[in-house]
Amino acid sequence: MHGGLTLGKSYEGLEVVEYPYLRVANVQDGHLDLTDVTSLEVPPAVAEGVMLRPGDVLMTEGGDLDKLGRGTVWEGQLAPCLHQNHVFAVRCFPHKLLPHFLAYVTASRYGRDYFEATGKRTTNLAATNATKVGAFYIPLPPLAEQKRLVQYLDTEIGRLKAIQEIIGKQIDTLTAYRKSLIHECVTGQRRISAEDLAGVGARLPEAEACA
């Protein structure tokens, strides 16, 4: 596990280069938000020690308790790119552990129970630390099994997201129709007939119709 860059240090007298770096706000629950990436100037030697590599599993030090410790895999979207010290970068041994498998483990009920139990809670937020992240026990099936599980979860989650998107569009359409219908009725553009009222009554649940 690699710690990140501590902000506010002075590098006076040293040659510096501008690098983008990830903040806690960039690491979301299961994905990265790279719409607003900040940059800063540090010496190349300092940057080398906190530079992200594809396959690093990113975890935030603090946030909502139910999202604490959830891993997001860095795919090299920006190169080079550094990370702040409040963002942990876990680098897996490729012959033992797949990054995406680790990310799914941290998002599982097993992972959630661990980080919720070990997280330090404050009024609105919770926090973990490098020691607790390092102590997280990771089940290690053979790499072939890890790969199979990752492929299965990727497929199923992708399918569920597609269904969710379709339902979301349907809800948007129905919401727009509802607003249009209300507008037409209250402005007199649509006349309500006895048949319309009878149809509404027929669709009401029995308990409501009898109330």
Locations of regions flagged by a protein language model:
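Sequence-specific dsDNA recognition surfaces
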Residues: 1-11, 20, 25-57, 203-206
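A short glycine-rich beta-alpha junction/loop motif
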Residues: 7, 80-88, 120-147
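Short, solvent-exposed loop/turn positions at domain surfaces
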Residues: 8, 46, 122, 159, ...
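A short beta-sheet element
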Residues: 23-24, 48-107, 125-129
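Hydrophobic residues in beta-strands and at strand termini
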Residues: 24, 42, 92, 138-140
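Active-site/binding-pocket entry motifs
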Residues: 27-28, 65, 112
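A structural connector/turn signal
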Residues: 40-41, 46-47, 77, 123, ...
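Amphipathic alpha-helical coiled-coil/heptad-repeat segments
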Residues: 113, 139-211
